[in-house]
Amino acid sequence: MKPYQRQFIEFALGKQVLKFGEFTLKSGRKSPYFFNAGLFNTGRDLALLGRFYAEALVDSGLEFDLLFGPAYKGIPIATTTAVALAEHHDLDLPYCFNRKEAKDHGEGGNLVGSALQGRVMLVDDVITAGTAIRESMEIIQANGATLAGVLISLDRQERGRGEISAIQEVERDYNCKVISIITLKDLIAYLEEKPEMAEHLAAVKAYREEFGV
């Protein structure tokens, strides 16, 4: 685990974005941990979040021309990541996002920001069922752009309805790489360093045994 990944876990724990306990997911599964990126909700939170996304992007080595944030959660993420890339990595790249409803006056259309073209890096909080990615792909393809990759905050590394994860489905269906700031594996490595969290470690490992990929 890299220093920025450890720092991200501590940041998420400090903001209660990442919690341990017993949580019922939309899928009906009982999970020993829960991640709610919506709780990164202040100016300082967003500034820090952008730095972690930018760090993971640079670390991945993937090449891209533009950041795309799907509405709604992806919008602030794309914005803060673009700022962090410019301020901390000297990479001044365009970004854009979509509107849920197309506008019929003014600039019109369903995109805001830069023109959607070239190699697109899609940024979002998490991938649960991959629905947002599929909707975004329609927009990207309609504009003649290509998907360079997807960046999310956490990869839960768990099976979807079949034998593979929603993330593996996205990688297979769109022939792209999905990268994340942290994975379930990183989370377990972090818990292993913390004796006081042994109870959570056991629960997370048991969950991975049952649902992991």
Swiss-Prot record:
Keywords: Glycosyltransferase, Magnesium, Pyrimidine biosynthesis, Transferase. It catalyses: orotidine 5'-phosphate + diphosphate = orotate + 5-phospho-alpha-D-ribose 1-diphosphate. InterPro entries: OPRT, Or_phspho_trans_dom, PRibTrfase_dom, PRTase-like. It comes from the Bacteria. GO terms for biological process: 'de novo' pyrimidine nucleobase biosynthetic process; 'de novo' UMP biosynthetic process; pyrimidine ribonucleoside biosynthetic process. It holds the Pfam family Pribosyltran. HAMAP family: PyrE. Catalyzes the transfer of a ribosyl phosphate group from 5-phosphoribose 1-diphosphate to orotate, leading to the formation of orotidine monophosphate (OMP). Belongs to the purine/pyrimidine phosphoribosyltransferase family. PyrE subfamily. This is Orotate phosphoribosyltransferase.
